[in-house]
Amino acid sequence: RLGHRIEHEIKKYGTLPPKDFKKWAIICEHIIRHYTEGWANGFRYNIQYWEIWNEPDGHPDMMQNGMWRATPEEYFELYRITSKHLRTCFGDSIKIGGYASCGFYKIKDAQDVTGEAFGITNELSDWDKRVNHFMNFFYQFIDMVTTEKLPLDFFTWHSYSQPADNIRMQKFCEKYLEKAGLG
């Protein structure tokens, strides 16, 4: 994964976005070259999959997001710049993806795994707000990737649910990505 380290401390230092997204993309390029091409006294590992960040969708209140303390739009811009830069540098020799979504928990109890029947209710708990945020972030991200034809060779997500729920979420994700032309 390209991005920060996971911080469980109260005060977090590595969850703010980079100040210069282009510079960060170049740093990512150098990390990849270090691990795959031996650049800077590095290695020659056969690492093909490179994920851009981790859980930028963690919470609708960016100050409570333990992985990305910035707006969704800022993450989208980071992904846009980094994915294009890495594709230019490496072509199809690496797989570019992300964003390690917090998951599709809204799908868990839904009748329709296509995701087309989901609405947002008026009275929401903090968890409900987060779950809706996960979905909205996903929809916006996929829309950006498809509209702008950005590199997305794979999509990652997490779930800490029961196996049957995970299967429903996986089916939803696969169907949605296929419908968007990314399957």
Predicted regions and their residues:
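Substrate-binding cleft and catalytic face of glycoside hydrolase catalytic domains
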Residues: 1-152, 156-162
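Catalytic-core region of carbohydrate-active enzymes that cleave or remodel glycosidic bonds
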Residues: 160-183
